[in-house]
Each structure stands twice: as C-alpha cells, then as structure tokens.
Amino acid sequence: MTFRTLPIRAAAVAAGLAVATPALAQNASFFVVHGIPGRDVAATADPLLPVDVLVAGKYCLLAGFTFGSVAGPFDVPAGSYSVAISLANPIAPCTNTAVITATATLTAGEFGSIVAAESTSGAPTAEIYPVDVTSIAAGKQRIITSHAADAPEVKVTAIGSNPKEKAEFKLQPGKQNESTVDTAQKFSISATPVGAKGTIGPITVEAGDRSDILVWAVGNAANGSVTLLSKVLPDVY
C-alpha cells in the first residue's frame, strides 16, 4: 500500500532524508503511531513499551517512542523505505535487534500513517494506512478511522457538540472508514465490538473547521487492551 512540535532528533532525521529532494511537491508525508501496549507483550513489560524507529537502515527517526504516541507528520522524498522497530536502547538508540520490520512505499504528494500494532494473530506488525488530504469544504470536517487492533468488527460512533453532528459506522479489522461531518468544536468518539458488551473509549477530540480527525483503534481484545488514539490534521484546504 502506498501513502503521505517534532523532537529535535526526529526533525534532524527528516531533514537528512529530505536533502536529496529539489522540490516539496516530490515529497510524501507520514505519521508514526505506537499502538502496542506493553502488557500485550509480557506481564512484566513496561506498559508504555518504549521503542526506537530506524528508517532506511541508518536514520534513527524516533528514540524511546511510547505506546499511545503519534509522531509527525514527517516530510521525506518519495520512494521506498525500510522501517525497523526495536525495543528502546536509551544508551545507543536504534541498535537493538528489530522486532518489527516493514517496507513503506511513499508516492509523491501522498500522506499516510505507519502504525505499529497487533495483527489478528496477535503478532506485532507495522500496518500502513492512507490519509486523505484532499480539500475539505468550509463548515465540514473529515473523520478517518483505521481499525488496527487485534479485535473483531467494531461499531464506531462520533458525536459532536450538537447531536446532529454525528457519524456512525461498522469497521472490520485492517479496514478504514472516512466520514465527512458538519464542523463541531468537539467530538466524543467511541467503539463497541459488534455482538459484544462493553465500550472502547470514549475519547474527546477537539478540532477546527476543515480538519482531518484521524482515529486508530489499537490493542488486543483478548487482553482487554483495545483503545482509541487520535491526531488532528488542521486546515485541509
């Protein structure tokens, strides 16, 4: 699949990757999402499960990156990049053996998210989800929800400040939904496993007009760790 306040280290790495590109139009952009809680790995693991993210075999993009965090967006030249995720090494970041590897193919002008998550078999993996950055009309917002959890189909509900500002849909594992809604200053977003009791969330997301509201479902249903993460991409004109 193809797709598009940084820490000083990450900003420097992104700048290094961008050296070869003569024009921004040839770039792609992406977020990195940490969606694996430590308790899904081992009972004794750090709940935040800090990891390091190495790109292209030599750029340590993120060090000590913790569960629930969303980093970026990063702008890089279009192309294919290896991504290696390892348990964090605070002394020598990005030098531990990779526990997740993936290849991200970035096409010029595209935007996306690389999500460290659990597959439906429970194994750690890196999934790539596109982010729609086409123009949004005035008075509208776009909610883009990605099901990256080791969990069954869920019913997602997003309710704005006014009950008329609402989106509701079902989402299969590994799939994505895009809903355009009337602008609300604040949305309450929750998910319910289809055919099961209990609600995931809600989380509260604040966003301005013409914003992309990005939501990722991550975690493991069997361990009771499924949660919702979010990021706002403002001013999508």
List PLM regions with ranges.
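Intrinsically disordered, low-complexity polar regions and short flexible loop motifs
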Residues: 24-237
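Bacterial N-terminal signal peptides that target proteins for export
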Residues: 2-11
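...the same signal can extend to comparable exposed beta-sheet modules
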Residues: 1-2, 189
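Cleavable N-terminal signal peptides
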Residues: 12-13, 23
